Regions:
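Start-of-domain marker
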Residues: 1-26, 32-40, 52, 57
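Alpha-solenoid helical repeat architecture
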Residues: 1-2, 34-41, 74-85, 117-125, ...
Length: 368
């Protein structure tokens, strides 16, 4: 395992910058590995590289092989460490595919296995992943609680300040969801101090989410500024395909809200095929929402109706995305003169808005 850990420390910064290189080097390491546990750690690392290349089927196959090994092995702290890596990776793949509830289950299992393992140095990372997942499910109080736990682990593990920025931009996301933009900006500023030390995918998270924070306060010029930086970053790395198309979708909606219909159509068209190819349900729900509104702004009611009938409906939808869909459906029914249905979607959004103070109260209770 010592050889694997040395290799991991050497290669980890290349994971998001050049996952193809990581695949090649890791396969070479696997061919000479003599320790079976280390071999399957290499395999999980290979799965991470496949995920960054958006090759989800290959990532799943690698994780399945590693889990079969664990299931047949004698229980031990080393096997628990490997289980933790597998379930953390499964959670990350679920996030990429928009399977929000499943990601919570996987990250919780990863955390539980890590507690029973021999390497607790990654507890803060898994805590951050679990916090992110709870925020996506709308459980902002639980998300904030896990971010605070991550900070506590950072303290006990003596993680330096320059490596704590994922917690800060995570907390910023919580406050963005609650529309407390003063606290949101405070935590984004803390994260921004370490921007030069972030890996490319971390820079993308910061830029994209900070752009979203301006989107939600209807400051579209500032949102565009951050989304454009995010797109430029993603296009600088050939394997950041997911990040590139996610940013294109955000640009598309921002232009839509600015009534720049041609630019909106251009960016939404760029990202459509990719998200359909990986079957990311959350992204497709979001994309379908934008395409409905785009048809309305193009004065094409029949196309809007067609897109509504074909739009996917995931088992779970994040409150923000439901709010956006409801707003555009209200617009559609106003256009066709069905004011009863338009009023229904207006009231649904009022219900979502009314739930935010309750979430904020729960969050404050956890902080005190």
């Amino acid at each position: 395992m010592d050889i694997y850990m040395q290799y991991y420390d050497f290669i980890i910064d290349s994971l998001s910058k050049n996952p193809s290189y990581v695949c090649t080097r890791t396969a070479r390491q696997m061919s000479v590995a003599t320790d079976s546990v280390a071999y399957y750690h290499y395999l999980v690392l290979l799965a991470k590289a496949y995920m960054f290349k958006s090759e989800m089927d290959s990532a799943k196959l690698s994780m399945d092989r590693a889990e079969v090994f664990c299931d047949g092995a004698e229980p031990s702290s080393l096997i628990n460490d490997l289980y933790a890596e597998i379930y953390n990776m499964r959670g990350n793949v679920c996030v990429r595919q928009g399977l929000t509830d499943s990601s919570v289950v996987c990250f919780q299992k990863a955390f539980d296995y890590r507690l029973k393992g021999s390497n607790r140095d990654m507890l803060h990372d898994i805590s951050i992943n679990l916090a992110d997942a709870f925020v996506r499910t709308g459980h902002y109080d639980k998300g904030a609680m896990w971010y605070r736990k991550a900070l506590s682990y950072c303290d006990s593990l003596k993680i330096p300040e320059e490596k704590r920025f994922p917690v800060y931009y995570g907390l910023a996301q919580v406050y963005m969801e609650l529309r407390d933009f003063t606290s949101c900006d405070h935590y984004y500023e803390l994260a921004a101090r370490q921007y030069d030390k972030m890996l490319p995918f971390e820079k993308h998270i910061y830029l994209n989410n900070r752009g979203n924070s301006y989107y939600f306060r209807a400051d579209y010029p500032n949102a565009l500024e951050f989304f454009r930086k995010s797109l430029l970053l993603a296009r600088s790395y050939p394997d950041m395909i997911f990040e590139e198309h996610l940013t294109e979708m955000n640009l598309g909606e921002t232009f839509l809200l600015m009534n720049q219909v041609d630019s909106a159509a251009y960016y939404l068209n760029l990202c459509s095929d990719f998200f359909r190819s990986i079957e990311n349900q959350t992204a497709l729900y979001y994309l379908d929402t934008q395409l409905i509104e785009l048809a309305l702004k193009q004065n094409n009611l029949s196309l809007a109706r067609k897109r509504m009938s074909e739009a996917i409906q995931p088992d779970y939808v994040e409150p923000n995305m439901q709010h956006i869909r409801n707003r555009y459906l209200q617009h559609y029914f106003e256009e066709v003169g069905d004011f009863k249905q338009a009023y229904y979607y207006q009231m649904e959004n009022q219900r979502i808005d009314d739930s935010t103070p309750v979430s904020y109260t729960h969050l404050r209770a956890h902080e005190t």
